[in-house]
């Protein structure tokens, strides 16, 4: 590649990678291009990222088993998605960095700060052990998301999301869920 400055990462795929097509059509039409983009990026030494709203469990499996993708998000929970963070961590957390999956409406928009902290801690319990996890919302936060809920998410990370030298999150045990 002819880049003088390398980006931090390359986003491949897109917001609705699997929403508007079947897995078979994705494999036939999109996966070859996504794989090639990932190969090029990895060969130049930078990370790759897929953001795909909606049902994503099958996409996570494909990306983990058939590509060298670095990170995938937003790992939305039902009803908008189909992801179970603990299951994805167990199956693919050694291969992919998982990013998500705080519910943007039920928790961030309509929840209380305590709801946000509880959801953040649960996500860290489900996905954080051993690293390769980025706590994030399931997608963007709506315009009317209360500032105190955004601050609560930051608080949860600072208070409970600090790894020790063994890749553990020891502060999580202090939070009763």
Task: Describe the residue ranges of each PLM region.
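Active-site loop segments of alpha/beta catalytic cores
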Residues: 1-177
């Amino acid at each position: 590649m002819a880049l003088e400055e390398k980006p931090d990462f390359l986003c491949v795929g897109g917001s609705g990678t699997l929403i508007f097509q079947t897995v078979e059509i994705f494999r036939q039409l999109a996966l070859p291009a996504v794989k090639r983009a990932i190969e090029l990026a990895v060969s130049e030494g930078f990370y790759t990222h897929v953001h795909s709203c909606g049902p994503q469990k099958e996409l996570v499996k494909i990306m983990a088993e058939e590509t060298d993708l670095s990170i995938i998000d937003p790992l939305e929970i039902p009803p908008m998605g189909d992801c179970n963070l603990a299951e994805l961590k167990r199956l693919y957390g050694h291969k992919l960095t998982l990013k998500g999956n705080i519910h943007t409406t039920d928790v961030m928009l309509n929840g209380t700060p305590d709801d946000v902290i509880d959801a953040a801690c649960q996500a860290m319990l489900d996905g954080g052990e051993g690293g390769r996890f980025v706590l994030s919302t399931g997608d963007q936060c709506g315009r009317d998301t209360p500032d105190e809920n955004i601050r609560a998410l930051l608080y949860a990370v600072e208070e409970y999301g600090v790894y020790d030298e063994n890749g553990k999150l020891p502060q999580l045990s202090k939070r009763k869920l």
